[in-house]
Amino acid sequence: MAGHSKWAQIKRKKGANDKKRSAMYSKHIRAIQAAVRSGGSGDPAGNLSLKNAIAAAKTDTVPADNIENAIKRAVGAGEGAAEYKEQTYEGYGPGGTAIFIETLTDNVNRTVADIRAVFNKRGGSMGNSGSVAWQFEKKGIILLRDASEAAQEVAIENGAEDIQESDEGLEISTAPNDLYAVQDALSAAGYAVESGQITMLPTNTVAVAGDDARKLLTLVEYLEELDDVQNVYTNADLPEDEED
């Protein structure tokens, strides 16, 4: 789930069991192959969608061999290969939270039915297109373990829009088109980037705790387990003990 803490999300994904990790890898492989086909190239230097898909896969520790093989298969795929369409869905969760879902699907009817079923069974409600999308904006996010002033200066000088400091390090936000300029500048200056990818951030957050928080996390988990769902974003501000 994408929401309050990007560091908590990385910790949760790295701690996923084998079954969940395998499903997560499969989603990334699908995204990489779809990016190759839609962008018409297996070279990330000339295909920004592919570059973003690879960055997301690396953040979730997808092995380099898996990524390379996915690109090769997509480049060599013939006309009979499955065509996946990017589709977004919106809804509401416990505590008045907004939920924005990104999918890659070869069957829109199946996908919307699956998502609606999860909302109905897990205490949420599906919304119309545009009902909550306005509460999110696309941003580049870089996580850096080094929280020094020098690192922050490099980020700011190269286009960072906002920097949040925590015990884990820095969470740097950029305009989507500036993500790689900031990331490359940090790497060139000798800073080890934990992750860098395009994501959706809430413009405002809603504090959710207790039973509502637990119900929301369950709803998001079931949405994330759907094969066609790539990312689930919420505007929830969760207590740290609920995020872990």
Swiss-Prot record:
Residue ranges that the Swiss-Prot or TrEMBL entry lists as coiled coil: none
A Pfam entry, by short name: TACO1_YebC_N
GO biological process: regulation of DNA-templated transcription
Ranges for region Disordered: 1-23
SUPFAM superfamilies found in the cross-reference section: YebC-like
Annotated keywords: Cytoplasm, DNA-binding, Transcription, Transcription regulation
InterPro entries given in the database record: Integrase-like_N, TACO1_YebC-like_2nd/3rd_dom, TACO1_YebC_N, Transcrip_reg_TACO1-like, Transcrip_reg_TACO1-like_dom3, YebC-like
Cellular component GO terms, alphabetical: cytosol
Cellular localization per UniProt: Cytoplasm
Domain of life: Bacteria
GO MF, one example: DNA binding
Entries under NCBIfam families matching the protein: PRK00110.1 (NF001030), PRK12378.1 (NF009044), YebC/PmpR family DNA-binding transcriptional regulator (TIGR01033)
Stated family: Belongs to the TACO1 family.
Protein name according to UniProt: Probable transcriptional regulatory protein DR_2548
Native species: Deinococcus radiodurans (strain ATCC 13939 / DSM 20539 / JCM 16871 / CCUG 27074 / LMG 4051 / NBRC 15346 / NCIMB 9279 / VKM B-1422 / R1)
